[in-house]
């Protein structure tokens, strides 16, 4: 199976937006757009990534959050209309990022789930849920299990950190113990990063608050691969028996540092093993193959080194 991984699309669409829609945290997002984010992240780069994935024979698409810039209805509709043209609901798994839960209003009405999954997740027969909780849920495709988690929640201005909460970690452990899941190659999906790549004072305002609890649950439950976004940076780590991977933002078409260029990954799973990770990089106006690695190339980190 070939699994395509994109993240941090930051799709911008202000159709129908009103002035009063910006009397909240969107005000800071608006300043970021004026300051250059709107030029840095482009829709065409996302479309080029999806085109390249389709041409490469990707079987299943994974999106690890930040589909939108400001969690506006117009943004969700436009980005999902685009994704629908490449991968239908049976061939994709999507989790939210902090930009998809940008305001309390967008979280309260669960705009993300309305546009991405519909209003009744339990009506989707292929989703394995834990009781009445919407997150996490599992989807099994062949011998691969995708477990989707929600690390996004409305936070104060200038805070972009994530949290899963005890109930999601407990439900994750319950899902991992199920017989039909335990026998699969298990991939956990969330938006926020676990390993603090940049050790700056403000990093605590960006990373996953309960990353140690989450990683312990993954280790104990036999998660093979964790895919995330949020950093807009390429990184590949191995902690214990669990691989952790981020390609970067797939929508970045203008960049100053090479590591911040638009990227996406294609993971090849054979016989319940990850055999190849192909990373594509945006340059000269389109995506090109950049590098291939195997699990042995991931940087090993002792569990105690996760700050």
Predicted segment positions?
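Active-site neighborhood of phospho(di)ester-bond hydrolases with catalytic His/Asp-centered motifs
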Residues: 5-7, 60-65, 92-98, 150, ...
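Active-site environment of divalent metal-dependent phosphoester hydrolases
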Residues: 10-14, 69-72, 98-106, 154-159, ...
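Active-site-proximal segments of metal-dependent phosphoesterases and phosphodiesterases across multiple
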Residues: 159-163, 179-224, 231
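A short C-terminal boundary segment appended to hydrolase-like catalytic domains
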Residues: 269-307
């Amino acid at each position: 199976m070939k699994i395509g991984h994109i993240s941090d699309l930051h799709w911008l669409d202000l159709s129908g937006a009103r002035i009063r829609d910006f009397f909240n945290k969107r005000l800071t997002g608006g300043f970021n757009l004026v300051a250059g984010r709107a030029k840095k992240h482009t829709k065409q780069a996302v479309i080029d990534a999806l085109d390249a994935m389709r041409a490469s024979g990707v079987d299943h698409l994974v999106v690890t959050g930040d589909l939108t810039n400001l969690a506006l209805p117009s943004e969700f509709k436009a980005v999902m209309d685009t994704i629908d043209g490449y991968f239908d609901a049976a061939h994709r798994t999507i989790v939210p990022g902090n930009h998809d839960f940008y305001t309390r209003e967008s979280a309260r009405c669960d705009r993300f789930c309305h546009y991405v999954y519909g209003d009744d997740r339990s009506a989707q027969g292929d989703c394995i849920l834990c009781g009445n909780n919407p997150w996490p849920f599992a989807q099994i495709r062949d011998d691969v299990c995708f477990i989707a988690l929600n690390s996004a929640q409305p936070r104060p201005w200038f805070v972009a950190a994530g949290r899963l909460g005890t109930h999601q970690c407990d439900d994750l452990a319950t899902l991992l113990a199920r017989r039909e899941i335990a026998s699969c190659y298990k991939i956990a999906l969330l938006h926020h990063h676990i390993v603090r790549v940049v050790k700056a004072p403000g990093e605590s305002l960006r990373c996953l608050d309960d990353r140690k609890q989450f990683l312990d649950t993954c280790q104990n439950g036999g998660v093979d691969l964790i895919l995330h976004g949020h950093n807009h940076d390429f990184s590949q780590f191995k902690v214990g028996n669990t691989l952790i991977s981020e390609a970067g933002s797939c929508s970045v078409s203008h960049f100053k540092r090479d590591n911040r260029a638009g990227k996406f990954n294609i993971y090849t799973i054979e016989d319940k093993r990850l055999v190849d990770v192909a990373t594509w990089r945006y340059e000269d106006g389109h995506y090109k193959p950049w590098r291939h690695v195997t699990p042995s190339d991931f940087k090993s980190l002792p569990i105690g080194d996760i700050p």
